[in-house]
Amino acid sequence: RRTRLVPPYMWDIAHSLACAGIADRAFFDIVFGSVTSSIRHWPASGLSRLAWAASKCRLLSPQHATTISREARKREFGGFGAQDLSLLTWALAAASHPDGDVFGFAFSLDWRQAAPESLSQVYQAHLVSKLELPANGLALPPPVASSGRAHFLEAARQARSSDLHRDVSKAFERLQIEHINEYTTDDGISIDIAMPSSKLAVEVDGPWHFLRTYAEDTKEPNGSTVFKRRLLQAAGWRVLPIAHFEWEPLGNEKARTSFLRRCLQPLAPQLLGR
């Protein structure tokens, strides 16, 4: 049945799979096959939603990213509204396939009436340009970047601290390591547990940070999680991810404290033994 699917079902299903964290490589291969053979029939919204979904599932290859970016340029971005471009720029940024023409056009738009989510997405593309590609000279205008930063940070703050997060924080307390929960960097990136003086960011990753199949969870972080780690590293932070499937099986405080000590030893040994 998959082979008979035609747009718009393809990008709708791809979007739904990404929202559920299901990385169905076979399905995405079929969808990109349709893109390759009939891209001129795909609307801008379909291409952008597909790029976002594939990037979220870590299935946006350099070839696929180039195909979609080239088509957007070929159309001179006709039909690409603010939401479409925010999805596309985020997808390219998150997958490490930035396109200067796409970014440049998106950054030149008037974003004042854009939805908060769109501003947050294009701001993350702005961070890639700022932190990883400063030589390209592409950036959002300062007022837009400021607004995007605020919406990006607000979205992170809406995610409440989990029991897992609090438990990891308690382990730091047992080790007598000073730390800050829900720390915000200058660029507006929220860190679960931070030691600013050591530039160490601890990211506590629950199940929603990982991809899954139709039958079970995997241990592969999703595109958003990998992207955030990369932005933190580009900003000069060392990142220590602590996954729920590593932490929760440790049955007592002693085991969890020992685990945390082992994780910290290669990254920040100066924090230990205080």
Regions found by a protein language model. Give the residues of each.
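Eukaryotic RNA-binding helical-repeat scaffolds
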Residues: 1-274
